[in-house]
């Protein structure tokens, strides 16, 4: 499956949908990826968050829990959230079929603050997974080019779905905001989705904060993040 196909994309963690085994496996995958990025220094302390899309109708995501060391997560350290990024467990407003899973699996109940933006990205782009880290290069690039980082004629652009030559790719930059509705609106304003002739841009820099990247699944989201970070390093080094 490819990323950025739009809201109709079937990118979900498992065709089985929202089940105990699917949620447990998703939690383990998120914990492993979080440890990877913590080791790189991209998720210092409790910073950063990751998500996996579990279902689309209605939209349900597993998001890493708030306030936990991202290098020490377990498969239970996730929160099930809806299309607004709100917890869907027992007692939550509009709770759905996932009520019992939070209790039976001992899942967390407080999602990361940016869960709302993860949900917005999953809905708008059709992504199956999203990653948000506090990588220094992305922050530096957002400071250097607040209107967006222009990349072209770089080989690694192929890794994020673009041509290595003759194509101008812009990694969008938005201002940081604590209100995820505002930040989500800004994301939609600058999002460059796929067209018949060019691929989407699967990354977003939030100024003075960090970077989001997404993909059809967690592995592709990781590739997009790592490649975008490397491309930003080149842009800064050659300006």
Question: Locations of the language-model features?
Answer:
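Glycine-rich flexible loops
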Residues: 2-239
């Amino acid at each position: 499956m490819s990323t950025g196909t739009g809201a109709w994309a079937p990118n979900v963690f498992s065709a089985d949908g929202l089940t105990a085994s699917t949620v447990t496996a998703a939690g383990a995958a998120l914990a492993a990826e979080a440890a990877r990025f913590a080791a790189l220094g991209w998720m210092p302390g409790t910073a950063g968050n990751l998500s996996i899309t579990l279902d689309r109708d209605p939209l349900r995501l597993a998001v890493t829990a708030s306030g936990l060391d991202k290098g020490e997560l377990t498969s239970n350290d996730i929160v099930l959230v809806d299309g607004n990024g709100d917890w869907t467990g027992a007692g939550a407003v509009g709770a759905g079929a996932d009520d019992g899973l939070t209790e039976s699996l001992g899942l967390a109940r407080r999602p990361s603050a940016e869960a709302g933006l993860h949900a917005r990205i999953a809905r708008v782009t059709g992504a199956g997974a999203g990653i948000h880290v506090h990588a220094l290069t992305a922050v530096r690039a957002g400071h250097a080019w607040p209107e967006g980082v222009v990349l072209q004629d770089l080989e690694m652009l192929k890794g994020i779905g673009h041509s290595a030559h003759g194509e101008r790719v812009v990694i969008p930059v938005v201002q940081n905001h604590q209100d995820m509705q505002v930040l989500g609106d800004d994301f939609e304003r600058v999002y460059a989705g796929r067209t018949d002739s060019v691929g989407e841009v699967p990354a977003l820099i939030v100024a003075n904060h960090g970077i989001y990247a997404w993909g059809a699944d967690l592995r592709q989201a990781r590739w997009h993040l790592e490649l975008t970070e490397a491309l930003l390093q080149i842009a800064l080094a050659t300006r």
